[in-house]
Amino acid sequence: MSTPTTPPRDAWARLRALTPARIALGRAGTSLPTASHLEFQLAHAQARDAVHLAFDPAPLQAVLQQRGRRSVLLHSAASDRHLYLQRPDLGRRLSDEAAEQLRGTTAVHGGGADLAVVVADGLSALAVHRHAGAMLEHIDALAAHEGWSLAPVTLIAQGRVAIGDEVGELLQAQAVIVLIGERPGLSSPDSLGLYLTYAPRVGHTDAARNCISNIRGEGLSYAEAGHKLGYLLREAFRRKLSGVQLKDEADRPLLGTDTASQAAPRNFLLPE
């Protein structure tokens, strides 16, 4: 009779407590355990639900009103969710009515603010519902501290990242921030993305934008995202650029400091 052998230790197992990522799932023969398989199906269903969840701007509008912030509710050129998913280009532009409404807002209240903020549902309205209000509070506090003027917050249904370029251009803002629901992952249906563009103009590519991703409770905190955004905005205004020419060095250690001299962490997969 053969002696039972102990399965090899999974080097990833202890990391499950540190991340919601699908690692160290175990196995049952050549397949996944039933529990892991069911968790996968649930995560997939949650991701699909997040994509199709309708954007409800009313609670965010109420919060902004309580803070004394003006907001404008707009719609992209994609008339519904089905068209939005089939035609990404329509989500990058305002509808004709929305563009005219924004021109009217600029004519009445004036343009030329330092910073315009756009909130768009993107591919996860759930992320916007959960995190946009708190992130806007950090942005407002940052702007107040730096003395930056703010345009009205624009809330956009069926919007994609590039729609911020048109909004920023119509508002004549120096820079635009887009808060948008990111494409849901299997462990993150509510991840909020933040995109910064200096001198926004229709036709900009992704190369002109800086991205701060995965803003959520289990990812990047609001405070950490605000810290990175503060660095990027200050540098964008100082250097008059954004995108690939502007690197996020907010946490870069300074030469000669204790932080810079610390040894690099060991690879946990290597033996001690």
UniProtKB/Swiss-Prot annotation:
Its EC number is 4.3.1.7. Keywords: Bacterial microcompartment, Cobalamin, Cobalt, Lyase. It is found in: Bacterial microcompartment. Its cofactor is adenosylcob(III)alamin. Binds between the large and small subunits. The keyword Lyase applies. Pathway: Amine and polyamine degradation; ethanolamine degradation. InterPro entries: EutC, EutC_C, EutC_N. The keyword Lyase applies. It is an enzyme of class 4 (lyase). Catalyzes the deamination of various vicinal amino-alcohols to oxo compounds. Allows this organism to utilize ethanolamine as the sole source of nitrogen and carbon in the presence of external vitamin B12. This is Ethanolamine ammonia-lyase small subunit.
